[in-house]
Amino acid sequence: MKLTVILLMGSRDLTEPGVVAGTLADIAFNIAEGPVIVRHGACPGANSADQNASDWINSIGNRHGVLEDPMPADWDNCAPNCPPPDGHRRIKRPGDTAHPGLLPDYCPGAGPRRNAAMVAKQPRPEYGIAFPEPGQPNYGTRNCTRLAEAAGIPVKQITP
């Protein structure tokens, strides 16, 4: 049986988040020839592509050989190559759930660093699935898509 690693990237604010579960079910039940690992950025939120993938995997997928490999960004810490903190770190807005962490501010480079780590981690993803939300900036989704494609990982865009 062949292991399939999928790199999942997507909006935190999908208007039709059910498309994520439907896509993963199609891959698991109709395309994959063995166990599936879904690597995602663990972005929280009811309409997040990552959260919807995690919810489906933990409710149905894991009974059918689908596992998740969540890789949350470390929003609290800067990397050694980040600019000095003054002016670099951003203050969280009230109710900010997109940048979970303990501090009142966050490193804006944490998401791109996490995306690069998801692309580079072994076993290497066979392909990526991107769930951008039409009309939204989708910064993280676009960043991860570019990194994956630059690494030779084909990415399929799925929009409702």
Question: Predicted regions span which residues?
Answer:
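Acidic/glycine-enriched connector segments
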Residues: 2-4, 14-160
